[in-house]
Amino acid sequence: MIYKSYFLENNINSLNEKITLFYGENLGLKNDLKGKIIYNNKNSEILRFTQEELTKNNRALINEIQNISLFEKSKIFFIENVNDKLLDLIQETESIISDRKIFLFADILDKKSKLRSYMEKSKNCACVPCYE
């Protein structure tokens, strides 16, 4: 599913997919959307990763998804600087993620990008292009 960024600026809660990819050159828009996600999920535990951290230890994300917290209702994951190298891990997590959400943030991804293509076609994933 592909969402228009201007639609989400006022309706960020309409993101129902488990995994959402924000990509493009408009860093300010991506940061605004990230802020709205955080604001609307105040009771959730927010965990942040970079792609570099996850490529060094790809079990870190899987372990955090499978950990059940007694104190927090849900978990939200932000993964920064993603590209095609993370596709295998995303596919693996898509099958085990339940009430958690993953938000991926990338720079410019061209149409040939495997990650972008997968996210656009998957039923559990969404894409949000962030261009000016």
Go through the PLM ranges and name each one.
Residues M1-T20, E25-E132:
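Non-catalytic interfacial helical region
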